[in-house]
Amino acid sequence: MSRALSTLLLLSVLLPAVVGAREVRVEVRDPKGEPVADAVASLTPLEATPVVQPPAEPVSVVQEGEEFRPHVTAVVVGTRVTFPNRDAVQHHVFSVSRAKKFDLPLYRGEPREPVLFDQPGVVSLGCNIHDWMSAYIVVLATPYFARSGTDGAAVIGGIPPGRHRLEVWHPRARSALTREVVVAGGGAATQVIALTLGVDRRVRRAPDSAGGGYK
């Protein structure tokens, strides 16, 4: 996470915002109006406890080309995640995040067991061999979420009517944006968010990394 100042502003000034839809499209933009990818938008009901059902099969975060793919993954609490290594070299995946600490020593192919993510929060991933490899898993206690694509849009569907907490997170933002919205009916609605990101402080990839590392 960057220490640089990050400012998140909703273009709407009304709190709570009334959204006449059961589907919410969250459009994340930078101050110049350009789309922001890899933002996680979630809606948490405020009038009832959301029912969270983790998927039966593990979610995969792949190591390929000495990178984690995807860079940002959003899951619900209770999801198991596997970290297949498709590279010829070995990787050592780990996290020291409060929401999940784990360590997968040097391996190729499939690790023995998936990792269970049983607490909400943001989990930062790294590789002990390749310093530039980084990724994030956002663990949520709500089933209503989406990750923005290259167009900056995150579309959240199946939302029950009522008051919700909208939260938008990005790895280069100092903190997540939160606000209240009211989902009032059917159809679709759009929330536009202006997001200023801090400096990207990821370690640069080693120029001679291809084919290197531990065999």
Predicted regions and their residues:
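N-terminal secretory signal peptides that target proteins for export/translocation
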Residues: 1-2
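Generic extreme N-terminus detector
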Residues: 5-6, 25
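Bacterial N-terminal signal peptides
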Residues: 6-16
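Extracytoplasmic copper-binding redox domains, predominantly the cupredoxin/blue-copper superfamily
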Residues: 21-215
